[in-house]
Amino acid sequence: MNSKPCPDCDGGGVVTRREFLKTSITTAAAAAAAPLVLPGSVAGAGAKAARSETIVATLYKDLSEAQRKAVCFPFEHPLRSKVDNNWHITDKKISEFFNKDQQAMIKEIFLGLHSPEYAQTVYNQVEHDGGNAGGFGGTSIALFGEPGTGKFEFVITGRHCTRRCDGDSVAGAAFGGPIFYGHAAKGFDEKPDHPGNAYWFQALRANEVFKALDGKQRELALLGDARGEKGTDTVKLTGKKKNLPGIPMTELSRDQKDLVKKVMADLLAPFRKADSDEAMKLIEKNGLDHLHMAFYKNQDVGKDGVWDVWQIEGPAMVWYFRGDPHVHVWANIKAKA
C-alpha cells in the first residue's frame, strides 16, 4: 500500500454526521455497493463517492472523549496488526457502546469493505456466527492513529471476523494487514458438503485444481497435517521462494495455472475491488511461479476425497483455508515478508 494520506479522509473529504444520516443505509447488498454521495459543498465539483475510509473519519469525529479513550490507540500500537479466529480488539460491544447513528456508520464501513455481490452474505455470516454474543452488534472495533493525518486504521473483530480499513496507511500490505473470515453455518461440526457455508465455494474451486493434477503432481500437492492455528503466527510469512509446502506453480501446465488463478479470484471475490486488486498486484509482484499449493488429507471431513483444508503460500503471502470442523480462513499478503 502507498503510505500517502488518503484524500477522502482529509478535511475536505469528511462527510458530517448530519450529512451521513441523510443517506439511506440499508441491509441489502445493493445498498452496500451504492456509495454515499457527498453534498457539493463537501465534495466539491463532480461530487465523488464516499468510501469506507470517509465514514471512518466521520465516525472518529463523532466519538465522545470517553469513547475515544476506550477504542482509540496510537497507530503503532501492537493490537493493530493482531489477527485471530475469535477475539475482540476491545471489550466494548458495538451494540452497547455506540449510539444508533454510530452503529449505522460501523455497519456501512463493514459493508463497504466487501464487494457488492458478497457484502450482504458476509454481513449475514457475521450476524449468524456472533449470535450468542449479539450478532454483528457483538463485534468490537478499534481506531489507530487519526483520520486525515496519513496514518490511521479501523479494525473490526469478533467471532470469525477480522477486517481492516486503512486508507492506504499501511504500506505494502493488502487489506491493511492480516485478515480472518470463517463460518460455522449449520453447527460447529459441519457436514462434508458444508451446507449453507458462505465460503465453501472457495474450497470447491480449489479442489478443481487437485482434480486436474496427474499422479506425480498429486504426490507433491497432497500432504498430511496442516499448520496449526496460532493467532497472528498462523500467517507468519517466510520470505521463501522454494521448498514451501505443496506443489510449486512451476510444476503446473498453463491450464492448471489458469485454474489456480481462478482460485485466487474466488478468494478475493468477497472483498472490495480496491483491496482485491492490490492483493493480486502484490502477489504478482513477488512472482506467481513462486506460489505453492497444498492440500491436507488428514483433515478430510467425511473421508470423501474433497479436501477441506488447503493453502496457497508464497514468499510474502499465505492464504490458509481450514474447513475442519467448520471454515476458518486466514490471509496475509505483503510486498515483502
Model segments located where?
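Sec-dependent signal peptide hydrophobic core
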Residues: S24-A32
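N-terminal secretory signal peptides
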Residues: M1-E19, A34-P35
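A cross-kingdom marker for long, charged
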Residues: G46-E65, K69-A337
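Short intrinsically disordered, low-complexity segments
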Residues: A33-L38, F210
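Signal peptide processing junction and immediate N-terminal pro/mature segment
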Residues: V37-A45
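N-terminal domain-start interaction segment
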Residues: T27, L38, K230
